[in-house]
């Protein structure tokens, strides 16, 4: 038994280091793939940077000043701190449909005119070749919807100001300066600056679509917190257009602010004009009451103390009135726990206490003085209110006639000379990094997913003797390989027809040399066997068993030995294609009793050995192999040939190898480098041993010299020359 220990021993202490070296080796092995993918992504990034439409950015600066309060309340500025300008509502106003809608109407932004280029790369190529874009000036355009959908028109420039307009179901000719109408479409072209044959695509979107598009490229932000300085920015591919749009938005915002301020002043002025007669009437009544009382009391005048108290009371009342007006404004902006609101309430409480103190002093005066004081206070308070209203009326009249609002444009719109997109250097760097990341990730993922045997030590760790490691023949691989199944698979597909025979067509190949080494090993391995029949099978399909067995037959035949090659793979055997011999009469016909030996044995002249091909595919391959004729064939061959090589199907696919193996003296199992796992090889050999087959060991076929494998297992030559560990 060669599979003495099927359990994998514990990993060495250098396992992590080996894994790291293996991954580094994988990157080195696939360096061409990594370089190619990275270069591809970098070139894509370069092409994108060169061909994509440059995007420019324009900006303008607008200042929102603190709104001026009522002139009556100006005396409170020392008591109540000024609040910062409210920028958030102004930002929302700038982005509103009211402001943007006016700009869209002014600049006809509903109309879309685009020159027609070759898809994807046409515009960028025209820009790289310095081709001047055409210009189309439209003074009026109306394109109705068609079946509820926006329709596009194609305008083709002609000679001498003529053009052709194509739409859904119509084609009409027009001329610059003349109105064109067709099927509801109305168009007036003011000017055309383009070569004949140039095409433009015309379309018209709704106002809401235009506003949404504008909002997508227009941003407003406050330059610094509570500064009132608003920065308006816009991006687009037309630097002149975005400048005009920004200036229009800023001007429309300024005009609406002025109009709003004028409307407020007008309403306040109307209110004052209604209130002034009433206040004047109340003042006249108060003065008349005071005069009547004095006449009744023989012109009673206030003493000095009463006059002083009167002035104080009137002053306190005026301040309380101002606080009442101010509270009405503050309550709309702040809650009662706000510092500004609390300062106002504290001031009111102080004034209320002062008024109570003054009222106590008045209560101590004679009744006549108290009445005169009360009437005088009414007159003074009414006169103060009346004068304040008169002053405010004059201020509002002046403000209305010269309204400037609380907004001003600091910096008109300017477009930066260099585009903000694409960022060419950044795109190229990102493309390089992305390509490197994807290629390295794919290589490492493939390495992680790969579980195939890559070194003889992996099999020997499972107690499996490795008789030879046969390198991949690049010469043969180039002539037979089709393609991989996918990126993450190691399995190669090869042709099974019109393929060269390596042992004859390129006998100096390293793979043939490795088979010669196998011939030497087999000479000693088969010295004590019961017969000279060698069975070669594989763990799974595509392991290369036919290549190994056929090459071994040729190599042994070259040493002047009589060799018979039997293709016992009755399902997928293709040795007849390899040897270019007939497959009409083969093993299946002999086992079925249709043909005799002299009819199925053919001589392969180039290889120097005899061949029994597969024959026609039978419906019952396993049953045929179990017949006595198969045993009789092997006994006859053992007597008439120096060596008989039997190529059987893969062990894990079908049980044919176990059937044939009981009649042979020596068996070898072929494992494909990177394809078959150690577990598959162990399981195959276990099944053969359970069937009573004398399985000597394994052959590692298709070995590829890799840096990753060399780092992990440290062998330097295929099959029989391992580096010594110091």
Swiss-Prot record:
The keyword Membrane applies. Residues 54-424 are periplasmic. Gene3D superfamilies: P-loop containing nucleotide triphosphate hydrolases. Residues 1-32, 446-726 are cytoplasmic. One of its GO terms (cellular component) is plasma membrane. Keywords: ATP-binding, Cell inner membrane, Cell membrane, Kinase, Membrane, Nucleotide-binding, Phosphoprotein, Transferase, Transmembrane, Transmembrane helix, Tyrosine-protein kinase. Autophosphorylated. Dephosphorylated by etp. Pfam families: AAA_31, GNVR, WZC_N, Wzz. It is a multi-pass membrane protein. Its EC number is 2.7.10.-. InterPro entries: AAA_dom, Bact_polysacc_biosynth/exp, GNVR, LPS_length_determ_N_term, P-loop_NTPase, Wzc-like_C. It is found in: Cell inner membrane. GO terms for molecular function: ATP binding; protein tyrosine kinase activity. Disulfide bonds: none annotated. It catalyses: L-tyrosyl-[protein] + ATP = O-phospho-L-tyrosyl-[protein] + ADP + H(+). SUPFAM superfamilies: P-loop containing nucleoside triphosphate hydrolases. Belongs to the etk/wzc family. This is Tyrosine-protein kinase etk. It comes from Escherichia coli O127:H6 (strain E2348/69 / EPEC). The gene is etk.
């Amino acid at each position: 038994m060669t599979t003495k220990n099927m359990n994998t021993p514990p990993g060495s202490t250098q396992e992590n280091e080996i894994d790291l070296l293996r991954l580094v080796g994988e990157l080195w092995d696939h360096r061409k793939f990594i370089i190619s993918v990275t270069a591809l992504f970098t070139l894509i990034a370069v092409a994108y940077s060169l061909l994509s439409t440059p995007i420019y950015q324009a900006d303008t600066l607008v200042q929102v000043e603190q709104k001026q309060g009522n002139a009556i309340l100006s005396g409170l500025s020392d008591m109540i701190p000024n609040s910062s300008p409210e920028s958030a509502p102004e930002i929302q106003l700038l982005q509103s449909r009211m402001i943007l809608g006016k700009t869209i109407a002014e600049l006809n932004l509903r109309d879309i005119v685009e020159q027609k280029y070759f898809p994807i790369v046409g515009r960028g190529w025209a820009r790289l070749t310095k081709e001047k874009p055409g210009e189309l000036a439209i003074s009026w355009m109306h394109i109705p919807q068609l079946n509820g959908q926006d329709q596009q028109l194609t305008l083709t420039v002609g000679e001498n100001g003529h053009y052709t307009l194509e739409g859904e179901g119509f084609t009409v000719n027009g001329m610059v300066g003349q109105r064109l109408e067709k099927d509801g479409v109305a168009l007036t072209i003011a000017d055309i600056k383009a070569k004949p044959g140039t095409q433009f695509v015309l379309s018209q979107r709704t106002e809401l679509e235009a506003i949404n598009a504008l909002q997508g490229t227009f941003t407003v932000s406050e330059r610094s917190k509570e500064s009132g300085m608003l920065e308006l920015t816009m991006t687009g591919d037309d630097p002149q257009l975005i400048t005009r749009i920004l200036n229009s938005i800023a001007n429309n915002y300024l005009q609406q602010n002025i109009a709003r301020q004028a409307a407020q002043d007008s309403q306040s002025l109307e209110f004052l004009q209604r209130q002034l007669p009433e206040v004047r009437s109340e003042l006249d009544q108060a003065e008349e009451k005071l005069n009547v009382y004095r006449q009744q009391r023989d012109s009673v005048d206030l003493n000095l103390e009463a006059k002083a108290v009167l002035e104080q009371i009137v002053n306190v009342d005026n301040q309380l009135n101002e606080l009442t007006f101010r509270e009405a404004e503050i309550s709309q902006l702040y809650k009662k726990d706000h510092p500004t609101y609390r300062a106002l309430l504290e001031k009111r409480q102080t004034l209320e206490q002062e008024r109570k103190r003054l009222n106590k002093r008045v209560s101590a005066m004679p009744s006549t003085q108290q009445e005169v004081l009360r009437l005088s206070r009414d007159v003074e308070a009414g006169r103060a209110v009346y004068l304040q209203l008169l002053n405010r009326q004059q201020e509002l009249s002046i403000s209305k006639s010269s309204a400037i609002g609380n907004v001003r444009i600091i910096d008109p719109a300017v477009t930066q000379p260099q585009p903000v997109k694409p960022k060419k250097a950044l795109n190229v760097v990102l493309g390089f990094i992305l390509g490197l990341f994807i290629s390295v990730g794919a290589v490492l993922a493939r390495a992680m997913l790969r579980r195939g045997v890559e070194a003889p030590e992996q099999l020997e760790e499972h107690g499996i003797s490795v008789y030879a490691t046969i390198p991949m023949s690049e010469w043969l691989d180039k002539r037979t390989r089709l393609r991989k199944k996918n990126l993450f698979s190691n399995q190669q597909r090869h042709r099974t027809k019109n393929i060269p025979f390596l042992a004859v067509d390129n006998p100096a190949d390293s793979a043939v040399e490795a088979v010669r080494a196998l011939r030497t090993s087999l000479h000693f391995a088969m010295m004590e066997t019961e017969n000279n029949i060698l069975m070669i099978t594989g763990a799974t399909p595509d392991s290369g068993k036919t290549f190994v067995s056929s090459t071994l037959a040729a190599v042994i035949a070259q040493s002047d030995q009589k060799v018979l090659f039997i293709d016992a793979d009755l399902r997928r055997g293709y040795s007849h294609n390899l040897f270019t011999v007939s497959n009409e009469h083969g093993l299946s016909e002999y086992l079925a009793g249709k043909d005799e030996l002299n009819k199925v044995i053919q001589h392969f002249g180039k290889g120097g050995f005899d061949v029994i091909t597969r024959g026609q595919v039978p419906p019952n391959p396993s049953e045929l192999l179990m017949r006595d004729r198969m045993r009789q064939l092997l006994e006859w061959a053992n007597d008439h040939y120096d060596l008989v090589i039997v190529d059987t199907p893969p062990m894990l696919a079908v049980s044919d190898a176990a059937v044939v193996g009981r009649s042979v003296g020596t068996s070898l199992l072929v494992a494909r480098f990177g394809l078959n796992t150690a577990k598959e090889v162990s399981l195959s050999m276990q099944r053969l041993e359970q069937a009573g087959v004398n399985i000597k060991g394994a052959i590692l076929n298709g070995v590829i010299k890799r840096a990753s494998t060399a780092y992990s297992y440290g062998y330097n030559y295929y099959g029989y020359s391992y580096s010594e560990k110091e």
